């Protein structure tokens, strides 16, 4: 619908800005793997090399990121869901805030660094 169309338009604006010869951005951190893949495809169509001209990373570490070799932050979704459920279930005082640290992992792939397998 309209929301998806507007979303695509914003990604297209990002692609146009990053395609300008005077860009100063060397790395882009995108909010999810699907949007990162769209941006990578759009930049490649404009002759921008990934990661030589601009590095791209995203969030979620989905199968798309794994297949397309997109650097991605892997978030422990099951742990987050379980913790959220427990917090709601055991919430005693509505005004109290309990802090929890959740560890994510950065999975480095070819969208952010050129990997030479023979030199490993």
Predicted regions and their residues:
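Short beta->alpha junction loops
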Residues: 1-9
């Amino acid at each position: 619908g309209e929301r998806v169309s507007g979303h695509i338009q914003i990604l297209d604006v990002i692609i146009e800005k990053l395609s300008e010869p005077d860009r100063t951005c060397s790395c882009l951190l995108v909010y999810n793997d699907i949007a990162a893949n769209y941006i990578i495809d759009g930049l490649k169509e404009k002759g921008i090399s990934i990661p030589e001209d601009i590095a791209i990373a995203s969030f979620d570490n989905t199968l798309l990121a794994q297949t397309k070799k997109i650097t991605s932050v892997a978030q422990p979704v099951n742990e987050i869901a379980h913790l959220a459920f427990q917090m709601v279930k055991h919430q005693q005082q509505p005004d109290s805030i309990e802090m929890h640290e959740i560890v994510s992992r950065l999975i480095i792939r070819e969208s952010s660094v050129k990997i030479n397998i023979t030199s490993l």
